[in-house]
C-alpha cells in the first residue's frame, strides 16, 4: 500500500511487485547464488580474462553494457559483475542480478574519508545514512540503513583470518558528489559518519526488499578530512586487486 506524502521522495509503496520487474525480459539466465558485485573499474574485466571466466550474460543500459561473468573459485561458481557508480544504476543492476538468481552478494569499492584515515585502509560499514534517492523506493523512509549482521560477520571473519586490520564505520551515502559542502561535511562528521560514498544505503535497501544477503567492504580513497584542502590522493587504486581477492573469499565462505 502506498504511503502518500507532500514530498514525493518520502512516499513509499511496500508492494514488492511492480509494473516492470527485474526479470521482465524472461532471459534464459540462471546465475549462481553467490555474487561479487564490485565498484572496481577495469579490475573485474581484467580478472575475468586472467582466469578465463565465462561471460554468461549482459546487463544493457542506455549508455553502457555490463558483462556478467561466472568464475570458478575453489570449485564453486560465483557470479562476478562490475557495479555502476551511483545509487540508482547500482540498485537497478543489483536488482536485476537478484531477479536472475543471485542471493548472497558482497560488494567492494572506494570511499572518501571524513576522518583522518590512511589511503587503502579496509573498512566495514555497519550503518549508512540515507542521503540518496534509490533506497526510498525499496524501504520506507528512515534516516539510516543498518547492515546485515550475517554479512558483517562474514566480511570480518576473512579479514581477521588474514590478519588484515579494519575498522567498522558509519558511512554517508550521497547522490550529490559536487554538493558535499563544508557545512554538510561537518554536520555528517558530528553525526558519526567516518566516510562518504554513493551506493551503500541503496544496495542495503534493495537487499532488504528482495530478502537477500548483502554486505560491503570499503577501502579508503580521497580525503575530505581537511575542509580547506581536498585531497584526491590516488583514489585507492593500490587496493583494487586485493579487494577483489578478499570479496571472492568472503563470498566463498558465506
PLM regions: where:
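Accessory terminal and edge-of-domain segments that mediate assembly/interaction
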Residues: 1-106, 112-254
Amino acid at each position: 500500500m502506498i504511503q502518500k506524502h507532500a514530498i514525493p521522495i518520502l512516499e513509499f509503496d511496500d508492494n514488492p511487485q511492480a509494473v516492470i520487474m527485474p526479470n521482465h525480459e524472461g532471459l534464459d539466465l540462471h546465475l549462481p547464488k553467490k555474487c561479487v558485485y564490485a565498484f572496481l573499474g577495469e579490475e573485474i574485466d581484467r580478472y575475468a580474462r586472467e582466469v578465463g571466466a565465462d561471460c554468461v550474460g549482459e546487463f544493457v543500459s542506455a549508455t553502457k553494457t555490463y558483462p556478467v561473468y561466472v568464475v570458478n573459485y575453489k570449485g564453486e561458481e560465483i557470479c562476478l559483475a562490475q557495479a555502476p557508480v551511483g545509487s540508482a544504476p547500482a540498485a537497478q543492476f543489483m536488482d536485476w542480478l537478484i531477479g536472475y538468481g543471485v542471493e548472497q552478494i558482497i560488494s567492494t569499492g572506494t570511499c572518501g574519508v571524513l576522518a583522518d584515515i590512511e589511503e587503502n585502509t579496509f573498512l566495514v560499514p555497519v550503518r549508512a545514512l540515507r542521503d540518496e534517492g534509490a533506497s526510498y523506493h525499496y524501504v520506507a523512509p528512515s534516516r539510516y540503513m543498518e547492515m546485515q549482521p550475517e554479512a558483517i560477520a562474514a566480511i570480518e571473519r576473512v579479514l581477521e583470518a588474514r590478519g588484515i586490520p579494519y575498522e567498522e564505520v558509519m558511512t554517508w551515502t550521497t547522490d550529490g558528489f559536487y554538493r558535499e559542502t563544508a557545512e554538510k561535511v561537518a554536520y555528517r562528521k558530528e553525526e558519526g559518519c567516518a566516510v562518504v560514498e554513493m551506493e551503500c544505503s541503496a544496495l542495503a535497501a534493495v537487499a532488504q526488499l528482495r530478502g537477500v544477503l548483502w554486505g560491503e567492504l570499503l577501502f579508503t580513497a580521497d580525503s575530505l578530512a581537511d575542509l580547506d584542502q581536498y585531497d584526491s590522493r590516488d583514489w585507492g587504486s593500490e587496493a583494487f586487486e586485493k579487494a577483489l581477492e578478499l570479496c571472492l573469499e568472503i563470498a566463498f565462505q558465506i
